Amino acid sequence: MYKRQDYSIPTPDGTDLDLKQYEGKVIMIVNTATGCGFTPQYEDLEQIYHDCHDKGLEIIDIPCNQFKGQTPGTDEEIHEFCTLKYHTEFPQMRKSDVNGEHALDLYTYLKGQRPFEGFGRGAKAFAMSVMLKRIDRNYKSNPDIKWNFTKFVIDRAGNVVARFEPTADMKDVRDCVEGLL
C-alpha cells in the first residue's frame, strides 16, 4: 500500500496535485496522448468519470509524449483538444514522462506494484506485440509502460489493484472501477 501523501503530480499551472486529497477515493491514473489510435478511449474515460465521480472515483490524466511523439503541443493545447473534442472534465496534469530517468516517481511506484503482464488477445493486442518486438525484443521482461492509455486503478485504501493495457476492453476497466465503489 502506498501513502497518498508521498506522491504529487505536476499540473499545467506549475503547482503540484497532492494525491492525499483523494484519500478514501478510487483513483484511475492514465497516461494519455492526443494523436494515438487509442485516443478515442477519452470518450469511455469521460463516460466512466461522469457515471462514477459522485460515487467516489477520480481519474487523473497524465499526457505523455514518450510513445512515437503522439502528444505534441503545449499543455494548454492538449487540454483544449480534450475538452473540445471529448468534453473531458477530469483533472489533466502537465505532460510528463512515465518511463526512464525523468519518469514521475508515482509511475515508478505503480509499475513496481503492477508490472506488465501482456496485451491480452485480439487484433489490437497482436499488433501491439508485433510493433513492440521491433522496438525492443525483450519488452515483456520489464515493467515499463508500453504505450499510451495504460491505466492503473487504486482502491479506497490506497492499494494498486489493477493495471490495464491500452488493448484492454473498456468494459473490463469500468467493471473493475464499479466493483471498488
Q: Model features per residue range: what roles?
A:
Residues 1-2:
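Short, small-residue-biased leader/transition segments that mark boundaries at the very start
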Residues 81, 87-167:
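Thiol/selenol-based redox catalytic cores and closely related redox-interacting motifs
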Residues 56-73, 89-100:
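Thiol-based oxidoreductase modules, predominantly thioredoxin-like and allied folds used
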